[in-house]
Amino acid sequence: MFKIGNLELQSRLLLGTGKFENEEVQSKAIEASETNVLTFAVRRMNLYDRNLPNPLANVNLKDFITFPNTAGAKTAQEAIRIAEIANHAGVCDMIKVEVIGDDETLLPDPFETYEVCKVLLEKGYTVCPYISNDLVLAQRLEELGVHAVMPLASPIGTGRGINNPLNLSYIIENASVPVIVDAGIGSPKDACHAMELGADGILLNTAISAAKDPVKMAEAMKLGINAGRLSYEAGRIPVKYTAQASSPSEGLGFL
């Protein structure tokens, strides 16, 4: 359906794999979402020791585009090291650069993020940075050569939806690389809204894994994303300040 770098994504829903109650629920949610992209925190995969538990042991990663992230990194060097671990383990089709700058809000550090992207691009990675909804930063990263930008809707795990749709629209309208909305999506309505703004895709985790029924929510998110994309392509009617009758005025002469 669209590409990030040389990778073809069949679904506009990218699914995070953490926080699921158990492996069965995780597997069913993945199936219901119809995604072909799975993201995961490298530090949770125990890639450096195959004898330790692996939360994706029940998933055949060969069926998916693997999208590891550098969650847990607070510096550029930490993020680069995490990316290299994933790459050496052979589970790094593309990398989500995530460098947290504040422990309370979990907002990304723009300066460290830029440095990570610069190094990983030089090493040949397909790079997708997680950023705040900062148009100028998105533009600078695109100039650097990133393959997609991933602005947040609102802080990670808050489920607040799109806090600043105007800024998000600025990023989408000015980008020539895919825009994947990441973090803060709480419901299919939020996901649909982001897609109606013109986003290329949505990355979800908590909104699905923490739902009362993650499998149903995975399907609901898939439908919301598809509906939002169709709406964007169809083109909504303009917003007006005066009413306009939907029925024609012809035939009223007899009144």
Swiss-Prot record:
Q: Molecular function terms in GO for this entry?
A: thiazole synthase activity
Instruction: Name a GO CC annotation attached to this entry.
Output: cytoplasm
Top EC class for this record: transferase
Residues binding 1-deoxy-D-xylulose 5-phosphate:
157, 183-184, 205-206
Q: Which UniProt keywords apply?
A: Cytoplasm, Schiff base, Thiamine biosynthesis, Transferase
Which pathway does the protein contribute to?
Cofactor biosynthesis; thiamine diphosphate biosynthesis
Gene Ontology BP terms: thiamine diphosphate biosynthetic process
The record's active-site residues are 96 (schiff-base intermediate with dxp)
Reaction catalyzed: [ThiS sulfur-carrier protein]-C-terminal-Gly-aminoethanethioate + 2-iminoacetate + 1-deoxy-D-xylulose 5-phosphate = [ThiS sulfur-carrier protein]-C-terminal Gly-Gly + 2-[(2R,5Z)-2-carboxy-4-methylthiazol-5(2H)-ylidene]ethyl phosphate + 2 H2O + H(+)
PANTHER family this protein is in? THIAZOLE SYNTHASE
The family line of this record is: Belongs to the ThiG family.
Function text = Catalyzes the rearrangement of 1-deoxy-D-xylulose 5-phosphate (DXP) to produce the thiazole phosphate moiety of thiamine. Sulfur is provided by the thiocarboxylate moiety of the carrier protein ThiS. In vitro, sulfur can be provided by H(2)S.
What is the official name of this protein in its record? Thiazole synthase
Q: Which organism is it from?
A: Staphylococcus epidermidis (strain ATCC 35984 / DSM 28319 / BCRC 17069 / CCUG 31568 / BM 3577 / RP62A)
